Every structure is written in C-alpha cells, then in structure tokens.
C-alpha cells in the first residue's frame, strides 16, 4: 500500500529513484497466466463452443467485484465442481486452445486435483480447480477481458470491441469500458463498420450496444454507398441489413440498396440453398424504393434477374411514367412490405396469378378483394383499389376504378367477377366475363382490367382514359393506383397507369369466349378487354371526350378491347395480361391535362356511354367506333408513352386471338428496356407458354421493343381460318363489316391515332395456339387494324383510313396473292396491304403486329376501294396459309400470274401518290428453347433441330412450335423463313419505315442468360421532324470491340462507344412510315421485302433508337444483317453516302453506300448499302441467300447472296426511281443487304458469336430513311419479286433443309 500512496505523487515529483515500477514487465509476465493452466485455478468454458479460458481466481476477484462474488461467494466449491464433469474435463482436454500441451497438463492437474478432492471439501482448497460456463460472451471477447484483468493491458479490435465493452460493463471494469467507448469513435470506418454491426447482433441486449450501434448507424448513413458495396455487408445479420436499408437517412441510391440486398441474399442463399432466393430478397424489397431507380436500370439490371416481383417493377415504371397514377402509399416501404410478402407467397405462382393475388400495392385485403362487385373474382384489382376504398374497383373495375361500380355491374363486369377471371392481373378473367363483355357494356372498367382507357381517362396510357371520366373515380393515376397501373403482377407494380397492365388478363385464353364470342365481343369489344388491352394510351391529348367517350360508346370497346370477329378465333391459350408501361413524363403531364378536361367531358360522356353501353350498337357501328376510338388516342400519347402502352398491349385485337404473353415491353422510351420486356415476353412464352411470366432475365439487357408478334400460332390460326373462310367463302363477313367500319372510323379519327408501341403479342406457338392464331387472325384484322391505325394514325392520318380497312382486309385476306393482283387494280395501297397481310398469314412469318399492323392500318382502303376489294376478295378464295412450302410454291407460281396482273394493275395505279407502303406486321415468336443457347442459331437450324421435321411444312410448323419455346425466333413466313430469313427480321415486310425494326428481334433472342448481350432500341423518334434525307432506319450493325467498345468499322456518326447498339432511328415525321409515299408497282415479293425492310412503323423504329446490343452473344439473331454493315455508312448518318463510282469497284469495300432517290412527294435520297461481301451472310448462320432479304428499305439487311453480286436476284427487281446505283437492279440489292451464301465460311463475327461470350458489341445503327418501297422499287416489281421470293424460298427452304451443314 505504501506504493499506492507514493504513486499518486510520482507524476508530480521527479522520478523517485527509491521507487521502482515495472508495470509493463508485470503485465508481460502476467500474460503467461493465460498460457500456464497449471498456475490457474479456474477455467471458464466460454461461448457456444465452450472454449476454455483459464484464469487465476484471486486476480479476478481482486480486480472485479463481479468475479469476486462469482468465485468466492459460491455456496460450495463441490457444487461448482459438479459442473465440471468428466465430459467437461474431456472437453477441456480436447478443446482447441492456444497451448494444447498446457491444456493437457491442466487436464491432468485437474484430474489429480479432483481425486484429492473426492472427499467432501469443507473449504475450497488451493488445489481446487473450478470450471465455470460463460455463455454471454464470445471466447475471443472473454479472453481479452481476462487478459486485461490479469495484465491491465489489452489490444482493442473493432471485431471484438463491442463485446469487450459490454463485458467490461458487465464485470464492473469501468476503465476498460470507457476505453472501448473512446475507441469506438476512432475505429468506426468503412472497413470496420460491418464488423461492428455484426457483433452488435450478439450483444444487442446490453445498454452499451445501443449507444455504439447508434453511432455506427450514423456512420453508415453518411457513407451509405460505400458501406452497401462492402463485401462484408453480406455477413451482417438479416435484421441489421433491413435496419440499414430501411433508414431514411441512408445516403445511397435505391439501386445500390438493391444490389446490396441482392448480394446479401445470394450469400444467404449459398448457405441456405433450400430457401428460394426470391423469398430472401423479398424481405428487403419493401425497403427499396424501386420507383426511384431509372426505368432503364430497372428493366436492364433488375427485371432480368426475375427476383423482384413484377408488380413492384411495374408500379415503379408506372410511377415514373405518371406519379399520379400510383398511390404513393403503394410506393412506400411499409405498403410495399406487405405487398411483397404477398408477392413472395405467390412467387412460385405464374406471374399472372401473382399479379392477381399480388397486385403489389394493390393487394387489398381478401375481403376488399372480394369487393361486392368482384366478390367472385379474385380480381386483386379490387385490392388494387387499396388506396381508394371508394374506388375499390368492382371486380370489373377491380383495377380500374374508373368504371367501378356501374361498369362492374355491367355484364362485362360480371365476367370480371368470374372467379376465374383474375381481374386484369389474373388474366384469367373468366371467359364469361369476356362473353359478358359481349354485352356492349362499355364497362371498360368492368372489363376487369379497366381498359386503360376507361381506367385512366387521363393517362394517355392507362390513366383512365378521358373516355371514362368516371367523374367520381379519380383517375387511376390519382392516389388510387390506377388499376391499370397495377400490373397484372400487381404486387409490386406501382400501379403505373401505363402499366395498367391491362392485363386484361388476357383472360381465359383469348377467347374465353367461344370464337363466335369474339364476334359478339366484337360488338362489345370494350367489355372483353382486348387481351392486348392496349392501355389506351389515348393521349390525354386526345380529347378525352372523343377518345374516352368513343371508347364508352363502343360499348367498352376500348382501344384495348380486342375486337373479335365473328369467325371463331378462340385462342386455346390461357389469357396473358399485357403490361403497359407509359412514359412517365409524357403520361404524367398528359394525364394531368387530360384528367381535368376529360373528367368533365368524360362524366357527361360516361353517362351517355352508360346508356349506349346498355344498348349494344350494331357491330358495324361498334367497330366503327372502336376504330375511331382507336385512332382517337391523341398523338401525344402516341408518343413514346403510347408506344409504351402499346408495347404492353397486344396488337389491338389483332392478336387478341391468342393469349398475350404478358406483353411487357417496358417503357417504350428509349431507355425503357423494351428489350427487357421483350425478353420477358420471350421467356414467358418459352417458360410458361403464355404465362404472363415475363422472363425475368430479359435477354439480359437486350432492349428491344417487342413488336406484337403474331405468333406462328396466329399464322397457323390464320391458315386455318383461311381454310375455313375459303370453305365458307369470304372469310371475313364480319371482317368486311369491321373493315368498313374501320375505314369509316379511321377516316374520322385517323388524325388522332397515336402510334401504339406495336403491341407485343407473344404467343406460344403451339399446335393449339396455332389454331387459335388462325382464328384470331381472322377476327383480328379489325382489331389489329384499329390498333395499327392508332399507331399509324399519327404518322399516316390520311392513309390510315385505307390502312385500317386494309389492315382488316389484309388480315383476313392476308397472303392473298390474288388479292395482291386485285389490289393492284384496287389501288397500290391495297396491294401492299394485302401483301403485307398475306405475309402475316405466312405461317412462319413473324409479324410485328404493331409495326406491321400499323402499316396495314396505314393502308386502310377507302370505302369505295374497299368495297371493290371486298368484292374481289370474295371472288377469290382466301389465300391459304401455306402449311406446305410446296403448296406455297404452287401458290406462289399461281401468284406469278396474279403478280403479272397485279403489276399491270399496279402500273395503272402504280404510284398512288399517297398510298403508304404496307408492311407486313412482323411477329416475333417467342424464343424457342434453342435461343437460350449461346451459340447463334439460325431459324433454319431451328428447323433442323425440330423433332420430326421432314417437310418444309413440318419445319415451318415445328419452327413455330419451337418458337413457342424459349428462343425468340422470328417466325418466318414461307419466304421469310427461307429467304427473308436472311434478315434479322423474318417478317418479309419487316420494316417499312424502319428497316430494322425487326432486325432487332434476332438480336433480342439471345439466351436469356446472356448477360453480355444487351440490345436496346432507343427511340429517337422525332415525330416533329420532316422526313430525313437519310434513312436512320437503315441500320447497320457495327461490331464493337468489347473491351474498348470502339467501332470495329467506321460506324456512322460518332456512335457512342458502348455496348449499345444504337438504333438511331428517327422516324420520319410521318410517324415512321411514309404516309404519302405510294409504292411503285412492285412484285409481291418485292413488296414483302420492302415491307419487311421498309415497313417499320414508327414504333418499330422508334424503339430502336439505341440499344446496347452490347455483346450480343450467340444469338441467332446476332445481326447477320450487318456484320460489315458497321462500316456501311462511313459517312455520318446525316450524309447519304455518295454512290461509289462502281459500288463494286472498290475491292477493299464490301458494303457500298448507295443513294437511292425515292419517288416520294419529294424526292429524297435514301442511303442504302449494297453488300458484296460474302462474309455478311456468314455472319449469321448461313441462311439461304434470298433476294427476299433485300430490305428495300435500307439498311444493311443481309443481302441474299444474289445481292452480294450487286445484282438483285429478283428478275422483277427493276431500278425504281432515280437510283444512282451501278446496276439498274441495284436499288433493290443496294438496300444494304449483305448476306453471303449460306455455306460460306463463317465470318469472324459469326465465329465469335458462336462462343457463348463473344466479345462483340453489336452496334446496330439504324438510320431512318424514308424509303418507301415505292421509291426503291415499283409496286409491280415488288409484287413480282415477292412472289418470286416465295417460290424461291420454298425451293430454297427445301434445299436448305436437305443441305444444312450445321
């Protein structure tokens, strides 16, 4: 004690030499106690592992009152000894420790000690060795504590800091606790924060922990992004992760939060593989505000993972499109939590069901869900009304508050109620609903999915369409989530108005209603929500009244309402809800404006509509109204938002026949990952058939707006329909009627038609589907036409009348070579339309409904012409779908005569000044499973692979069926398959205005997993612009060095070097299609070709703007079209390449820029490329070289080998218009098609693409060029060429089938 007295003064006084202190030495020596068990008399078995920690009781007791009581206040050592049983001793003996030998000695010592103590011990003796169990602290923590007690020194470590602090507090070592608290201030950094938080889990019950954790969390808030990106973040306990993610102060963007949650989930999943990673991640989704993540990121990065409930993503997209469309509560973490939980429950369910049950925010309580109207329905939609009790959508309106009760009451609504109908989300709306819908009750709202129109009067897309002011209903956009918004998935979907997925639940397969029902429904299309349920993106701009009201008047024939034709078109497939997402900016604003105007007018109109709804109008009038309505959506909406919505919806009714795979083209906006949507659709198709399950892995990040594809099923259906109709005579009694109506209607509202993003109609191509397809096709035409007209209306108002009629006409008469001839007589436009249609008819030809259809709409035939055409068509048997290529060939040959006639007629009507080209709608078939493989596949291979494919027909059908699988292959029509197949898009008319609309599909269809390939089509749609001299649609695909992303070739214009394929596509002001350019007389084939190339409606092109095709991998679709094309436009986009002295003269050059003068209202130069490089063809799977490939339109479409020479193979191809091409026929060939013969050695690109991870980035440069086939090729030539192609294709196909070398 004297030292103790002396020490205090020592600091002040000079060192007192009489006092010697060696505290350091003492500490060092005392450390040996830990390593000398024989010197210790107490052993603590610490933690869960019971690790032994030895100590000296006297020291512990002297330093800590707690230990003194524990060790010396114990009633009897005997009792304590009892705890150290032989088992414990053995444990000590075996327990790992820093000094195993010492442990052994200790064990021996204990053994001897115990033997000595066997007799009752009156008092603890020095020999007695106590063993205590300490469970509160970890071994490392307790060891440090004992070290400090023995030596007075300890090294604090962030990992054990929290434990030591709490232990010091627990055992009364105040100095140590204070030291730890002080150390916390300096030890918290990005590297230690996770360790501190992880340790807090164990000591959360101690008061010291709370203070320390609070400091750590504050640090995390400040450095959120850094902390969330730490690998150690995955080691944190789940509740800690949730705590961090839920903090409002956390300074990290939502995507970073998502990534952190994903990392944690993956780590947890690795350790617990039996738990679905979706469920794991789902626990965090509620804390992530997905609506704050950019749409392109959502679709490119998050959606493809297929881990985040679709509803959440859709709600987020909808919110971005129109914040008003989503109830903020639905975006809030809490509500999302609940919804997520539901979602998780449903995750195993197909997406559609999930949507149904999980309308994300929307989920109402079950009771709510059962809102009186929809009680029977599962329509979650009612739950959707989550925000608005008042609006609980009646089952019908479950999603669409707009026409809530009244609508729901309408028979249509009852149909919604059908238990089967899952409300829009459910997509299984009972067919009866559909049937009910037949009842004209407009009840778009009743339609279960409220028709976007009805739902969102204001939102161009899904906002309740002005049509249905449902004055009482606030626009769905309003706090109440627009039902539309609720994506079918509904769960997470922040209801995006656009999103209004009018999932229309493609309720029961499209035609829950019997095919005949379609006819009925046709009358009441609105009621039966068009599977497409294109969200009426009626632009708010459109007068809400007109559009909205029209919709109402059409008894709920909403834009979305598919118009069923009388012909049976029942789709065997289950309904698939289309998902529409609108462009946030446009939608929101439009919605606002429209809502005010629309609500007032809409209320009035609504009343009228209700009355009208009560009285179904004549089919004709209804059709007319529908058409008018369809057209009505204002152009504003037709803007990206419209496209967006359209993308989600199926071609109006055109594809209604088949279930819609969840049409999810996410925001049509360039950034929006159309591709993602497409991929989703593809995957859905492949995985679920038509399950609305969107492939979560969009072809990774491949962005592409999906064109509504009339799936092969549809083609098949069409064929069947044709057969049926041919038997019955005019296949389209109702079609004619609708046509007429469409024409009339269209004429009126064509101006207002917004372009709809081509409704993506992915249908599983299956046997049953094929049949349905056919039926649907027959019935579809009007709808398609409507939809198309809507889409095209903007671009081609004047043409639209014709187009609408044409679309119907063509749809029904599709592939009527005869019709082509007739058309030539009737009018070039008609011919185009027919040709295009016939293409659609093509069994295999994929059709991008929106694009194509819009063209067909464009080609609406004037009433007078229509009448003539109808008569003519009636005279001719409907063109059969060629099941057999041979049959096709025969038909083609017959067609030659027709072509000749058509040419003559075409010459007469050669250049209808304003007839727009008719491009076939291109449908993308769902990727078949093959697609999922990285190696590029060609459709031909597909055929080869197809089991039992012996005949061309079989190949075609199988191909179709396969398409139903995973690969997203274009269904090629007969020609398209063989010759056209060359082009990325199989659709012969793949693009009329945008050559490459279709081409994207090929790229798109890479394996879902292929993360490296991203194909994004950016819409650079510039509606306002006049036509471009340059065809932006010309697309060249550039290979880009994966590492540097530098163009491998001279790419046009300084493209951003990125993984993106840029479709710098600026649709011409006409809306992408050249409204007034008449096609010169062309042979049908030419036409198809042209269509394929040229006809890409704005939609196709627009979405094309920029897509990171980034490292498209093996997709079959890798652009064969432009391997060398990348260099094709050495000049910037803006400069049409000057024709070369001799396009073929330059040996170094394979692609020769050709400037074609289009004969248009004004001559414009169209830049195209003539590819003489065989490699172009090689780039893709060798495809039969086929002139068909010529995409007259521009763009480097692969030129069939024939073109390689620079001379079109097509005899009929005559130079059209002033074409500065070396060869007269060059114009056709010059279209920049480059393709080599099928058997040429693989091009480097091809070789690279063969590897799963090729390093190319395809940059697809789309140049839009007003290239109407008229300019490029006279109409008659086109027709002739098309026919020729057909014949040739059938031959080639057979040859290829036989000679495929893959």
From Swiss-Prot:
Point to the regions of Polar residues compositional bias.
378-388, 410-430, 437-449, 472-487, 736-748, 1187-1207
Q: Which CDD domains match?
A: BACK_GPRS_like, BTB_POZ_BTBD19
Which superkingdom does the taxonomy of this entry point to? Answer: Eukaryota
Ranges where the BTB domain occurs: 40-158
* Region (Disordered) location: 325-532, 575-624, 648-685, 701-752, 834-858, 1045-1090, 1102-1163, 1187-1252
Composition bias, kind Low complexity: at what positions? 664-680, 1047-1056, 1107-1128, 1226-1252
- SMART domains found in the cross-reference section: BACK (SM00875), BTB (SM00225)
* Compositional bias annotation for Basic and acidic residues: 589-623, 713-723, 836-855
Basic residues bias spans: 337-364
Pfam (any one): BTB
Name assigned to this protein: Serine-enriched protein
Question: Can you name the source organism?
Answer: Drosophila melanogaster (Fruit fly)
GN (gene name): gprs
């Amino acid at each position: 004690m004297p030292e103790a007295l002396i020490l205090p003064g020592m600091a002040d006084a000079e060192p007192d030499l009489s006092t010697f202190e060696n505290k350091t030495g003492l500490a060092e020596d005392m450390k040996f106690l830990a390593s000398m068990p024989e010197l210790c008399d107490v052993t603590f078995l610490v933690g869960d592992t019971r690790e032994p920690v030895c100590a000296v009781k006297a020291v512990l007791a002297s330093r800590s009152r707690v230990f003194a009581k524990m060790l010396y206040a114990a009633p009897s050592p005997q009792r304590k000894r009892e705890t150290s049983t032989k088992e414990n001793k053995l444990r000590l003996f075996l327990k790992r420790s820093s000094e195993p030998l010492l442990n052994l000695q200790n064990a021996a010592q204990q053994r001897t000690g115990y033997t000595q103590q066997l007799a009752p011990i009156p008092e603890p003796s020095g020999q007695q060795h106590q063993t205590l169990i300490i469970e509160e602290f970890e071994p490392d923590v307790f060891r440090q504590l004992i070290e400090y007690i023995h030596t007075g020194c300890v090294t604090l470590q962030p990992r054990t800091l929290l434990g030591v602090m709490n232990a010091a507090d627990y055992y009364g070592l105040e100095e140590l606790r204070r030291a730890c608290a002080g150390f916390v201030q300096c030890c918290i950094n990005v590297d230690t924060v996770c360790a501190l938080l992880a340790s807090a889990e164990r000591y959360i019950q101690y008061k010291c922990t709370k203070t320390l954790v609070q400091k750590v969390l504050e640090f995390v808030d400040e450095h959120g992004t850094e902390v969330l990106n730490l690998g150690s973040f995955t080691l944190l306990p789940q509740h800690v992760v949730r705590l961090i993610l839920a903090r409002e102060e956390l300074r990290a963007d939502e995507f970073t939060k998502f990534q952190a949650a994903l990392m944690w989930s993956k780590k947890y999943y690795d350790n617990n593989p039996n738990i679905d990673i979706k469920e794991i991640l789902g626990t965090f989704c509620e804390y992530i505000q997905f609506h704050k993540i950019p749409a392109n990121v959502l679709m490119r990065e998050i959606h493809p993972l297929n881990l985040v409930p679709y509803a959440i993503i859709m709600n987020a997209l909808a919110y971005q499109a129109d914040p008003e469309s989503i109830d903020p509560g639905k975006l809030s973490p809490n509500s999302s939590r609940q919804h997520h939980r539901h979602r998780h429950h449903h995750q195993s369910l197909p997406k559609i069901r999930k949507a149904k049950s999980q309308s994300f925010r929307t989920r109402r309580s079950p009771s709510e869900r059962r809102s009186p109207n929809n009680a029977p329905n599962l329509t979650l939609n009612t739950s959707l009304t989550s925000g608005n009790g008042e609006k609980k959508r009646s089952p019908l309106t479950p999603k669409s508050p707009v026409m809530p009760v009244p609508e729901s009451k309408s028979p249509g609504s009852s149909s919604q109620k059908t238990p089967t109908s899952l409300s829009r989300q459910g997509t299984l709306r009972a067919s009866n609903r559909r049937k009910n819908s037949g009842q004209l009750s407009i009840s778009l709202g009743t339609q279960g999915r409220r028709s976007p129109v009805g739902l969102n009067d204001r939102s161009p897309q899904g906002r309740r369409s002005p049509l249905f002011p449902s004055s009482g209903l606030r626009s769905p956009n309003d706090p109440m989530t627009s039902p539309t918004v609720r994506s079918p998935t509904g769960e997470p979907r922040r209801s995006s108005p656009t999103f209004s997925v009018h999932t229309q639940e493609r309720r029961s397969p499209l035609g829950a209603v019997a095919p005949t029902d379609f006819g009925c429904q046709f009358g009441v299309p609105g009621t039966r929500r068009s599977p497409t349920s294109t969200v009426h993106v009626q632009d708010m701009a459109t007068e809400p009244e007109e559009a909205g009201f029209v919709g109402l008047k059409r008894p709920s024939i909403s834009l979305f309402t598919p118009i069923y034709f009388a012909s049976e078109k029942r789709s065997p497939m289950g309904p698939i809800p289309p998902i529409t997402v609108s462009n946030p900016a446009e939608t929101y604003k439009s919605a606002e404006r429209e809502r005010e105007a629309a609500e007032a007018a809409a209320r009035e109109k609504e009343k009228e509509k209700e009355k009208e709804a009560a009285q179904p109008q004549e089919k004709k009038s209804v059709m007319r109204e529908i058409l008018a309505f369809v057209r009505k959506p204002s152009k504003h909406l037709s803007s990206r938002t419209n496209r967006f919505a359209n993308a989600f919806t199926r071609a109006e009714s055109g594809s209604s026949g088949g279930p819609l795979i969840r049409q999810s083209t996410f925001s049509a906006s360039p950034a929006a990952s159309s591709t993602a949507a497409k991929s989703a659709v593809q995957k859905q198709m492949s995985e679920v058939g038509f399950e609305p399950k969107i492939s979560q892995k969009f072809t990774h990040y491949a962005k592409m707006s999906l064109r509504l594809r009339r799936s092969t099923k549809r083609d098949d259906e069409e064929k069947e329909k044709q057969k049926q109709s041919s038997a019955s005579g005019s296949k389209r009694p109702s079609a004619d009627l609708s046509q007429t109506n469409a024409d009339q209607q269209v004429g009126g509202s064509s101006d207002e038609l917004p372009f709809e993003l081509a409704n993506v109609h992915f249908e599983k191509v299956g046997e049953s589907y094929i049949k349905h397809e056919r039926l649907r096709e027959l019935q579809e035409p009007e709808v398609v036409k409507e939809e198309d007209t809507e889409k095209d209306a903007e671009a081609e108002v004047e043409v639209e009348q014709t187009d609408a009629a044409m679309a119907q006409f063509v749809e029904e008469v599709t592939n009527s070579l005869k019709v082509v001839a007739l058309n030539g007589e009737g009018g070039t436009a008609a011919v185009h339309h027919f040709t295009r249609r016939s293409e659609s008819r093509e069994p295999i030809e994929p059709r991008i409904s929106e694009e194509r259809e819009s063209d067909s709409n464009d080609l609406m035939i004037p009433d007078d012409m229509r009448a003539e055409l109808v008569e003519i068509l009636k005279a001719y048997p409907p063109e059969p779908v060629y099941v057999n290529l041979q049959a096709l060939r025969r038909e083609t040959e017959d067609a030659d005569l027709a072509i000749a006639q058509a040419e003559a007629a075409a010459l007469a009507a050669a250049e209808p000044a304003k007839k727009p080209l008719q491009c076939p709608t291109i449908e993308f078939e769902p990727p078949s499973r093959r697609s999922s493989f990285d190696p590029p596949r060609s459709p031909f291979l597909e055929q080869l692979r197809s089991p039992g494919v012996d005949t061309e027909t079989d190949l075609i059908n199988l191909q179709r069926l396969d398409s139903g699988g995973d690969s997203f292959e274009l269904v090629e029509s007969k020609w398209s398959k063989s010759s056209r197949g060359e082009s990325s898009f199989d659709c012969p008319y793949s693009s009329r205005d945008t050559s490459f609309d279709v081409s994207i599909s090929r790229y798109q269809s890479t394996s879902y997993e292929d993360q490296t390939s991203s194909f994004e089509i950016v819409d650079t749609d510039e509606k306002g612009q006049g036509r471009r001299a340059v065809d932006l649609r010309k697309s060249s695909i550039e290979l880009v060095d994966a590492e540097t992303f530098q163009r491998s070739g001279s790419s046009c214009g300084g493209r951003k070097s990125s993984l993106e394929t840029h479709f710098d596509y600026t649709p011409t002001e006409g809306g992408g299609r050249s409204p007034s350019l008449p096609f010169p007389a062309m042979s049908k084939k030419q036409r198809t070709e042209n269509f394929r190339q040229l006809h890409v409606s704005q939609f196709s092109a627009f979405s094309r703007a920029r897509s990171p095709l980034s490292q498209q991998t093996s997709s079959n679709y890798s652009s064969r079209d432009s391997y060398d094309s990348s260099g094709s436009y050495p000049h910037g986009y803006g400069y049409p390449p000057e024709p070369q002295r001799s396009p073929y003269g330059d040996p170094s050059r394979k692609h020769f820029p050709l400037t074609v003068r289009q004969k248009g209202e004004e001559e414009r130069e169209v830049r195209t490329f003539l590819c003489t490089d065989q490699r172009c063809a090689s780039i893709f799977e060798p495809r039969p070289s086929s002139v068909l490939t010529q995409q007259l339109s521009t763009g480097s479409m692969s030129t069939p080998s024939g073109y390689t020479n620079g001379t079109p193979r097509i005899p009929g191809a005559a130079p059209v218009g002033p074409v500065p091409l070396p060869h007269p026929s060059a114009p056709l060939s010059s279209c920049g098609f480059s393709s080599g013969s099928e058997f040429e050695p693989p091009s480097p690109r091809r070789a690279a693409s063969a590897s799963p991870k090729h390093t190319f980035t395809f940059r697809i440069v789309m140049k839009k060029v007003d290239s109407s086939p008229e300019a490029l090729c006279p109409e008659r030539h086109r027709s002739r060429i098309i026919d020729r192609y057909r014949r040739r294709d059938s031959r080639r196909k057979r040859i290829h089938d036989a000679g495929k070398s893959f």
